[in-house]
Structure formats: C-alpha cells, structure tokens
Amino acid sequence: MHWSDSYIDIPHEVLDCAQLVERALHEQFGRTDIHFPRRQADDLAHRSALITGHQADFAERIEEPVDGCGVLMLARGRQAHIGLYCLIQGVPYVLHSDALFGSSMRQPLARLPRCYRVEGFYQWL
C-alpha cells in the first residue's frame, strides 16, 4: 500500500487540488506548518494568481522529483494546478484533485490529460 491510496476518490468539492496537497502533507509527512491560501473563486486566472503569488513561500524547484514532492502543472498554459509526486514500483504518478473528473485521483505522469502539462517539481520549504 502506498501513502497516496487513502487520498483517491475524495470529491473535488470537499478538497480542491491545494487542499488535497495540504492534507496529505499534514497527515503523511508531518508538515503541519504548511497552510496554503484559500481560493476565493474557482476560475483559472484566480488559481494561477494564488500559485504564482505564493509559490516562493512554500516550495523551490528541484530537478529530480522525490516521493511526496510538489508537482506544478500548467492548465491551459497557466500555472494553475498542483499535485503530489508518487513513485510506485518505479512508475511516476501525480496525486491531484481534478474539477472536471469530480474527485481526486492518482494518474501516471505519462498519461496526464492534454489539458495539463507538468511545469516542474518542487520541494517543500
């Protein structure tokens, strides 16, 4: 069993992408010091502004991902979606909450939907 198993199929209206990451960091990695700003609107521009405006407060880019690090994704060309990197039996996945899908999921990085593109991997500060 992987630590991410218990975070699959949580409704998006219960935990959006940032809330899912925050909860997993608290519960699985003991990072109770991380509290992301809450979104005030569910639109791409607002989510992107939150991420780009606060990214340096929480994480710094790394070249090689490790289990539990942040995954920043571009959504329609904007830095507007985050998840957690999961390495399971040598296969890289991302755990994230997707509004269109309606819940959280763990997807192989190689099979992300076309609406997402990995911008980079980040270690938590």
Which residues does each PLM region occupy?
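Short, surface-exposed linear patches
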Residues: H35, Y93-H96, C115-E119
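Residues that flank catalytic or metal-binding motifs in active/ligand-binding sites
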Residues: D67, G90, R117
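A generic structural signal for short, solvent-exposed coil/turn residues
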Residues: A75-G77, C86, P113
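Short acidic (Asp/Glu) patches
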Residues: Q55-A56, S103-P108
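Catalytic Cys-His active-site segments of thiol-dependent hydrolases/isopeptidases
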Residues: I82-M105
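Glycine- and charge-enriched low-complexity intrinsically disordered segments
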Residues: R106-L125
